């Protein structure tokens, strides 16, 4: 749950080397989600712990490194977050979730997909700066992929269209400050 969804966007988690080596594979190497693959596999087999103490921080801006390695260049455009980069990333996310669920014969992919929908604001917001027409097309593609499973997806979508990213970020930041943490949806 929490460990799995948070590790995608924030670095800083640690997996024991001997545990990770057991699952070494090229399956998800160029996807940018190899760390998630290792985390999922090791958490299924070994005890895991999660701490809410912040030890890393994501800073907005700068040049993204997606597509910088040779194995990623066929999937991602280096130096920018294009619509296709975002869609490819989210498609790989689904492939990985489905692979893990099939591998372990459970419905974790359905649970994770619903959770992704509930917390899809950053996934939507990252492309809002491209204009309404492009943003609507991007959101349509996410819906087709299955990311619109909760009403939260639509709240974020319409709020981003009506209020824009800057106002939405302010509202979210204010709510987190009032509540003291990210709301449990």
What is each model feature region?
Residues 37, 44, 53-185:
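C-terminal subregions of glycosyltransferases and related glycan-biosynthesis enzymes
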Residues 24-25, 184:
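Intrinsic structural disorder/low-complexity segments
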Residues 10, 28-29, 125:
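Short, flexible active-site loop motifs that bind/organize anionic cofactors or intermediates
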Residues 3-4:
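Short, small-residue-biased leader/transition segments that mark boundaries at the very start
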Residues 8-24:
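Conserved nucleotide-sugar donor-binding
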Residues 19-22, 29-54:
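A short, conserved alpha-helix in the catalytic core of glycosyltransferases
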């Amino acid at each position: 749950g929490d460990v799995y969804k948070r590790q995608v966007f924030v670095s800083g988690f640690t997996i024991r080397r001997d545990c990770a080596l057991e699952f070494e594979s090229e399956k998800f190497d160029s996807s940018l989600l190899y760390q998630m693959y290792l985390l999922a596999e090791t958490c299924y087999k070994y005890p895991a712990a999660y701490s809410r103490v912040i030890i890393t921080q994501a800073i907005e801006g700068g040049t993204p490194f997606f597509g910088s390695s040779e194995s990623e260049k066929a999937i991602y455009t280096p130096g920018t977050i294009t619509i296709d980069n975002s869609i490819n990333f989210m498609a790989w996310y689904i492939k990985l979730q489905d692979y893990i669920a099939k591998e372990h014969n459970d419905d974790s992919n359905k649970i994770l997909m619903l959770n992704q929908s509930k917390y899809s604001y950053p996934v939507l917001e990252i492309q809002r700066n491209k204009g309404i027409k492009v943003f609507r097309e991007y959101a349509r593609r996410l819906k087709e992929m299955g990311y619109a499973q909760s009403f939260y997806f639509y709240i974020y979508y319409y709020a981003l269209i009506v209020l824009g990213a800057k106002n939405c970020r302010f509202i979210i930041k204010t709510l987190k400050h009032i509540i003291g943490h990210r709301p449990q949806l």
